[in-house]
Every structure is written in C-alpha cells, then in structure tokens.
Amino acid sequence: MAMIEVEHLQKNFVKTVKEPGLKGALRSFIHPEKQTFEAVKDLTFEVPKGQILGFIGANGAGKSTTIKMLTGILKPTSGFCRINGKIPQDNRQDYVKDIGVVFGQRTQLWWDLALQETYTVLKEIYDVPDSLFHKRMDFLNEVLDLKDFIKDPVRTLSLGQRMRADIAASLLHNPKVLFLDEPTIGLDVSVKDNIRRAITQINQEEETTILLTTHDLSDIEQLCDRIFMIDKGQEIFDGTVSQLKETFGKMKTLSFELLPGQNHLVSHYEGFSDMSIDRQGNSLNIEFDSSRYQSADIIKQTLSDFEIRDLKMVDTDIEDIIRRFYRKEL
C-alpha cells in the first residue's frame, strides 16, 4: 500500500466579485456575484513508503492548497487523500501523530523557551514515552547536530540552527510522513548542504516518506527520487529528474572559445533554424535542439568560420527546464 494516496482531489473556492464605485459596492452587497475558482483540479498520484517526492510548481499553482488538504487543514471539495491508510480530515488528533510538518518561513518552536524545554513540551503533546523520547533525542542530536545550542532560547538561534531545530521537532514523535515546505530558504550554501545530508540520512535510516516543496532546484536534484509538477492545479509532469531532463532537456549549448583576433561576424548556418547564437568577444555560444540537429554538424560549420581554441557541450540543467515550464515555453 502506498504511504500517500491521492485520488481525483479537487478544491474549489468561492469568491465574491466586487464592482468599483459606491453603486457597485451597494449592488455587490445586495446581490453579490459569486465566482468559483478551482485551486486544485482532479489530482491523482501515489507516493510509496520511503520515497522523497519533489512537489513543485510556480507561485499560485496549487501546491500550498494541496499540502493543506494532505495535512488535514483544508477539506477537499471532492476526491480524497489518504496518508498511511488514514483520511486526514476524519480524525486529525490521531492523524497528526503520523506526520511531521516543517514550514521554512514559520516555526513551531516556542520563542522564549530553551530548545530542550520545547522538545519536552512536544513530547507531552504527542504523548511520546520516556524511553522513545530519549532514543529519538539521541538520534536527532547525532543527525542534526543540536548539542551546541540545545540549551539556548529559541529566539537566540540563527536561521540555520532554527531550521535544524524545527526539523528535529517535526521528527520527535517518529512520523511516517514528513512534509517539508522550503526547508532551505534563506540559508547559506554550507548550511543547506548540512540540512540536505540530514534529510537524506533520516530518509535512508528510517524510511520516512518525504514530500518536499521548494523553489530551490538544487534541493530537488540532490534529494528527490521523483518530481510531481503542477500548474493551475493540474498535473503537468510526474517522473524522475532524469526523465524530466530526457523528455524536456533537448536544448543543448555548444560553447566555443575562439582564438583572438577574429572579429568577423558569424556566417549564416545553412540548413539550421531556431538556433540561438551569442557572440561576446572570444566566446561563442550556440544553443540548439539536439533532437533536430547533430552537434558534429554545428561544430563543422563553426570550424569553417573560426579558429577554435576550445569547445565544450553544456546540457540543459533542471533549473532551466523548469524555468521554461513556468514561462510556458515547453
């Protein structure tokens, strides 16, 4: 059985359309015009136990609404979601013991309490037995390296320390599923790497199923087994990072370093179209569709125009592919 099951999930919001001016405001008050907005449209997917799923999309795509339904905050208009065999909205008090949630821009920690005291409070909230609590704290201390600041008040923690502390708080009760919303937002490179290593270790050692939403595509490449991308509430891609690159990463770039003193313009490339050619000084970059053109033909044409010192092939990275998705270029 899948750890996360989503079938024909739909969420509609009804909003009132307000007309401008005093008359419009009065008319809207007496006879309000209602419009239905479909935030999530017929989503269906499954996440097996132990998988890290990158759940991505542009702002307004429906990610947050979907997460709120999966965590039991919102009730679906139709369809259903089931986490570890439980429907989130049916018995939230029991259900939340199966999940952990981390929001990068919000904290679940108590600002004025020392971090250790916060975990003690959470132990009581989640009804964690003493023996399990000490075992979990030993594990989380080791993985997330909390020992240097665990006695400090939460308000004194740096952003990176607070994020590690939040992840530990969400894992204290040993949840089956972890929802991570922008876990590395605002962090520097080294701290991001530490957070990613910790998430990977937790996933591998405990088989925790993780649903990750992020705009940092390095998180996706380094952490996720699979990508589920939505736009306007609908699925537009479901597959691995390599499948995404294979399907949509057909654009490649040949980057040439020219010998100095060649100031003439690039000649017309006979038989080629839809290529982007960028010449700056001794650098020449040619972007082309590898499903239509052979790189050898482009290199041959370029060698007939210029003397080349060096060249390299650059594949389209995941960030560029998803950027094109957002711009509706794919």
Give the role of each language-model region.
Residues 178-182:
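Catalytic Walker B motif of ABC-type/P-loop ATPase nucleotide-binding domains
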Residues 196-289:
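ABC transporter nucleotide-binding domain
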Residues 174:
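Conserved catalytic motifs of ABC-family nucleotide-binding domains
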Residues 112, 153-157:
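Conserved ABC ATPase signature
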Residues 21-29, 120, 124, 131-149:
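Conserved ABC ATPase "signature" region
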Residues 79-90, 95-96:
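Conserved ABC transporter NBD signature motif
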